[in-house]
UniProtKB/Swiss-Prot annotation:
One of its GO terms (biological process) is mitochondrial translation. Keywords: Chloroplast, Plastid, Ribonucleoprotein, Ribosomal protein. GO terms for molecular function: rRNA binding; structural constituent of ribosome. This is Large ribosomal subunit protein uL16c. Residues 1-17 have a biased composition (Basic residues). GO terms for cellular component: chloroplast; mitochondrial large ribosomal subunit. Part of the 50S ribosomal subunit.
Length: 139
């Protein structure tokens, strides 16, 4: 599963997810993409489950790009622990996703295959997503 090798600080504030994505909201590598339509914290487990679903569906066919990385630590306290005595230890990692962010990109497969792969992948995610196609300008 994805997680940073080294971070400057072990713990972070939760923060807020205001507005829509200003970066990472256009297709950069592939021909087809899965785009988030809601704000969410995507865990490294959810990203991995989605990646496995897409790669299993397209087999040796296309190339897949994961456009999100879980770089925010989420802390949790042990069960049945009294309040106080500081913040809990980091439990898992999340990627902060805003509406409009591209999650996965794929190329090298027919559009129907890519669309079905992304549909199956979207079932692994806790948000609504949409399938988008790169705008190719032929000259």
């Amino acid at each position: 599963m994805l997680s940073p090798k080294k971070t400057k600080f072990r713990k972070q504030h939760r923060g807020r997810m205001k507005g829509s994505a200003s970066k990472g909201n256009t297709i950069a590598f592939g021909d087809y993409a899965l785009q988030a339509t809601e704000p969410v914290w995507l865990t490294s487990r959810q990203i991995e489950a989605t990646r496995r679903t897409i790669t299993r569906y397209v087999r040796r066919g296309g190339k897949l790009w994961i456009r999100v990385f879980p770089d925010k630590p989420v802390t949790a306290r042990p069960a049945e622990t009294r309040m106080g005595s500081g913040k809990g230890a980091p439990e898992y990692w999340v990627a902060v996703i805003k509406p409009g962010h591209i999650l996965f990109e794929i190329t090298g497969v027919p559009q129907k295959t890519a669309q079905q792969a992304m549909k199956l992948a979207s079932y692994k995610l806790p948000i609504k997503t949409k399938f988008i196609v790169r705008n190719t300008i032929e000259s």
